[in-house]
């Protein structure tokens, strides 16, 4: 494949160049692996000040190799993949099918089981609403957990308004679902269980294989929101007995606006479409497939599959470095979620006696989050953390750091230093912290209500 890489220049024009390392795109390491070298925090692509990016659960930067794969579809192979009467359509269709094959390989599926969508939100809506409505005459019960992504919870709530019964399973303090409780909750009326693979807020990895086994033994379809899992942890839909699986492009260094839904063919999962039209994508998702975005998703999956072990080792190394740097230098902190059953690109940690939003503003040179980007406009404490039993003040003090493929040691070290400085500064302003330093147990204080 041509390794030419796109370079952003100051006037906004995109030009093709090869093996660039001046202000930001290509370096080659000792392992013959190509990396995009992202701009340092004191300069952006066009030279402006840019913060360090540690919000990988919100979105990831597009891998330059993905961008490279997409460019020809903007300039040469721009045909509609559904046009069957000329070469433009044939070429575009071939590229889309090649991308479909690459997406299928990363989860061990058949390419015919991959449906292109606009993202994981649409995939989740199709899976949950589509299965529930198709089988509603026979079964009307769905099971999920209280810590799912908003798109899953809202889909279930909409089904409740249509007359379906939904059970929202609690999770333990570690964020994991109780398998015995799941098993005992399934009834003859249960059509679908939907439990996410990796939680977007706390990084906890659910026991997907065990959940799939329970569902298969009980004749219940199993959907998992794998937006935060695909390309990060190994997934095999057959070994794990997964029937439906949601994928997001921009969570794996691919483009925004594209995703995929795996729909099992044997045993066949039937879906009532929620979008009608031209009958594309096996009639499940009508609408012209955005061939450029689909190819980008395919390229992202191909890279992620080949480099998953390397990425995982790098992310774990940086996670350990960040966690040690925080815990060695800042007292009274707590990691949220299970310490072992987790994806190490996600560190959600609470800083006692510090308001999370205040800390985010104080460390503005680091782009991170106090929770899901989908709910970040709300000042309410995270519903995921509250579901774990985290006290409200600790939930308010949580920060999520997202580590990824292109994160550097220098960025982690800078983050540790800026946290040390600003957590202490904010605590010094807190009368509660002063009382704790004096040995007062503030939980025993009866505060007057005025």
UniProtKB/Swiss-Prot annotation:
Name the UniProt record assigns to this protein: Probable cysteine desulfurase, mitochondrial
Broadest EC class assigned to this enzyme: transferase
Keyword Kinase among record annotations: no
Single Gene Ontology BP annotation: iron-sulfur cluster assembly
Organism the protein comes from: Dictyostelium discoideum
PANTHER family xref list: CYSTEINE DESULFURASE (PTHR11601:SF34), CYSTEINE DESULFURYLASE FAMILY MEMBER (PTHR11601)
Keyword Heme: no
Gene Ontology molecular function terms on file: cysteine desulfurase activity; iron-sulfur cluster binding; metal ion binding; pyridoxal phosphate binding
Residues modified to N6-(pyridoxal phosphate)lysine: 251
Range of the transit peptide: 1-52
SUPFAM superfamilies hit by this protein: PLP-dependent transferases (SSF53383)
Positions annotated to bind pyridoxal 5'-phosphate: 120-121, 200, 228, 248-250, 288
Family indicated by similarity: Belongs to the class-V pyridoxal-phosphate-dependent aminotransferase family. NifS/IscS subfamily.
């Amino acid at each position: 494949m041509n390794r030419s890489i796109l370079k952003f220049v100051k006037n906004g024009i995109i030009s093709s160049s090869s093996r660039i390392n001046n202000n930001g795109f290509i370096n080659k390491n000792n392992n013959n692996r190509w990396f995009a070298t992202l701009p340092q925090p004191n300069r952006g692509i066009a030279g402006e000040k840019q913060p360090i990016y540690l919000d990988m659960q919100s979105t990831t930067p597009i891998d330059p190799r993905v961008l490279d794969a997409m460019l020809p579809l903007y300039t040469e192979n721009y045909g509609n993949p559904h046009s069957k009467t000329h070469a433009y359509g044939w070429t575009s269709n071939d590229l889309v099918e090649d991308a479909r094959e690459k997406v299928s390989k990363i989860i061990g599926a058949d390419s015919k089981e991959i449906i292109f969508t606009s993202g994981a939100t649409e995939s989740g809506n199709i899976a949950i609403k589509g299965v529930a409505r198709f089988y509603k005459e026979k079964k009307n019960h769905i099971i999920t957990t209280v810590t799912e992504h908003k798109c899953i919870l809202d889909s279930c709530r909409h089904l409740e308004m249509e007359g379906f019964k939904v059970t929202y399973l609690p999770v333990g303090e570690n964020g994991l679902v109780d398998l015995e409780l799941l098993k005992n909750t399934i009834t003859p009326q249960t059509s679908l269980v939907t439990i996410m693979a990796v939680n977007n807020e706390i990084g906890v990895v659910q026991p997907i294989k065990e959940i799939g086994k329970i569902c298969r033994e009980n004749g219940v379809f199993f959907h998992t929101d794998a937006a935060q899992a695909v390309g990060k942890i190994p997934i095999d839909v057959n070994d794990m007995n997964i029937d439906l699986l949601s994928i997001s492009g921009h969570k794996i260094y691919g483009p925004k606006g594209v995703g995929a839904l795996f729909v099992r063919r044997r045993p066949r999962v039937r879906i009532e479409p929620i979008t009608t039209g031209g009958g594309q994508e096996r009639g499940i998702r009508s609408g012209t497939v955005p061939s450029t975005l689909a190819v980008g998703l395919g390229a992202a999956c191909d890279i992620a599959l080949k480099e998953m072990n390397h990425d995982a080792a790098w992310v774990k190394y940086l996670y350990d470095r960040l966690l040690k740097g925080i815990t060695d230098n800042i007292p009274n902190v707590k990691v949220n979620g299970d310490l072992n059953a987790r994806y190490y690109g996600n560190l959600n940690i609470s800083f006692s006696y510090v308001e999370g939003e205040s800390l985010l503003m104080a460390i503005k040179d680091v782009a991170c989050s106090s929770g899901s980007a989908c709910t970040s406009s709300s000042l309410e404490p995270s519903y995921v953390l509250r579901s774990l039993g985290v006290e409200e003040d600790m939930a308010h003090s949580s920060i999520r750091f997202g580590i990824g493929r292109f994160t550097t040691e220098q960025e982690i070290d800078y983050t540790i230093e800026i946290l040390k400085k600003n957590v202490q500064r904010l605590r010094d302003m807190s009368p509660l912290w002063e009382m704790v330093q004096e040995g007062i147990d503030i939980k025993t204080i009866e505060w007057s209500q005025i």
